[in-house]
């Protein structure tokens, strides 16, 4: 519904930014690394995820598309809600992706609110899905490039 928000930071709270967007100010819950780098008066452009509950509308914001997609995957795991996913992302998106791919239960259980069973469930459910999310530090490869690279390698193997 709300794919993103751009505006000026009007307040930095303990777990959220207040972003001025036209005549509105919107509270956006964000991972701690994003909050640490935000300053009142600075411009932000956030990728967002809106969560609707019976008694609450919550907006979660991320600096890049990869962290947003990781957040969406994390909340798909039973036992991990939006606030828990933000706690996990506070460890850094790249570190979380690496932990899921390498099945590092110890890393995940070191995060507040994540027990051994939830960590194991997250690894089982997400280890294959996580490969489709490019880390924020590396650009996503275009599928055609991968197919082209494979074709070139095959031709070189045949002596062409």
PLM regions: where:
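Structure-specific DNA junction-binding interface
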Residues: 1-76
């Amino acid at each position: 519904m709300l794919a993103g928000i751009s505006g000026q930071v009007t307040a930095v709270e303990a777990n959220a930014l207040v972003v001025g967007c036209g005549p509105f100010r919107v509270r956006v819950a964000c991972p701690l690394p994003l909050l640490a780098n935000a300053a009142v008066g600075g411009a932000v452009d956030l990728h967002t995820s809106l969560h609707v509950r019976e008694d609450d509308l919550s907006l979660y914001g991320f600096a890049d598309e990869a962290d947003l997609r990781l957040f969406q995957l994390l909340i798909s795991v039973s036992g991990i809600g939006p606030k828990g996913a933000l706690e996990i992302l506070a460890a850094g998106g790249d570190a979380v992706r690496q932990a899921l791919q390498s099945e590092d239960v110890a890393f995940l259980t070191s995060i507040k609110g994540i027990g051994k069973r939830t960590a194991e469930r997250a690894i089982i459910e997400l280890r294959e899905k996580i490969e489709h999310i490019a880390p924020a530090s590396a650009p996503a490869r275009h599928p055609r490039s991968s197919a082209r690279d494979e074709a070139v390698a095959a031709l070189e193997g045949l002596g062409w």
